[in-house]
Amino acid sequence: MTITRRDFINAGVTAAAGAALTPTLLHGDSALPTPSRAARPIVVSSANGLRGVKVAYDKIVAREDTLDAIIAGVNIQELDPEDQSVGLGGLPNEEGVVQLDASCMHGPTKRAGAVGCLEDIATPSLVAKAVMDYTDHIMLVGPDAKRFAVNMGFKTQNLLTEKSRQDWLRWKARLNKGDNWLDHDDDVRIKFTHGTINMNAVNAAGDISSVTTTSGRAWKVAGRVGDSPIVGAGEYCDNEVGAAGSTGRGEANIKVCGAFLAVEFMRQGKSPQEAVMQVIQRVIAMTEKRLLDPNGRPLFDLEFYALTKDGRYAGASCYEGGKFAVCDDKGARLEDCGFMYKRDQRPKMP
């Protein structure tokens, strides 16, 4: 039988339409889970969000939108000059410039927004939400992200606090023994952070949101963007399933799209704990040899946090000792992360 070009194209269109209408093709042999209402409102965050989860939870109980609530929660850290991992006072890049990244996702509307390499604006999470609310785009970066923020009414300020500037100068002095910078304060330990805050929430109606915000890796190459502003890596939510996010070495997470992967594992029926632990296994499997010790263990840490539509939650890290923040009707608290390796198996971190 001879097949014409038109027959071939029509057959392809028909097959594509059929595939689009068959959700089981995306999930192996199992059908999509039946959506359920949340058992209770709950907020889950990285450990540095302990104050923020309480703020977010109270707003959710007061029937505020889940995304507005968790952004208000992370704003606490963004505006705290003593927190050197996000926002105002965040540790700068190698040029001494604070560059911020953030992304957010709103489950009920299936919308998202993000900014990367944003300078002089202390609350990148709010700018990311403005990108979501007022544009047809998802991500804006660099000077144009700042221009957008200023046009939207955000106020500029110098984000480099004196404390962070002094840490940067100490790092710069010790960078190269043969340079022209004199070393001082030998007894002062220089911080080297991958600091970030991720927060996820579900309300009593089962609506879910997620946000991640960061100043990124301390002393990074100017222009570096990690996983935080990448929807599907630094954070992700699906209103029918749950949400997930991460903190730690962003480069390791980007390669596995960790937040998306965790949500997909939960869609398949895995518990939040099983999902985030399986993501960490995938991260380690995808790690290049130079970042592994002789026993195949990572020379970095990475944490994931996840919750489901019905209010189950978990946190996980590569090594024992990690904590994450939770708030529900029992109050705000820190809980232990699940882990891949025990504390005494941790190699010396670079």
Task: Kindly give the residue locations of the regions a language model identified.
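Glycine-rich anion/phosphate-binding loop at the beta-strand->alpha-helix junction
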Residues: 147-150, 154-241
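Extended C-terminal subregions enriched in glycine
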Residues: 249-296, 303
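Short beta-strand scaffold segments in enzyme catalytic cores
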Residues: 88, 101-104, 197-202, 208-210, ...
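Active-site-adjacent structural elements in enzyme catalytic domains
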Residues: 40, 51-59, 66-136, 140-147
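N-terminal secretory signal peptides and thylakoid transit peptides that target proteins
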Residues: 1-16
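Active-site- and interface-proximal helix/loop "cap" or "latch" segments in soluble metabolic
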Residues: 45-49, 59-67, 226-272
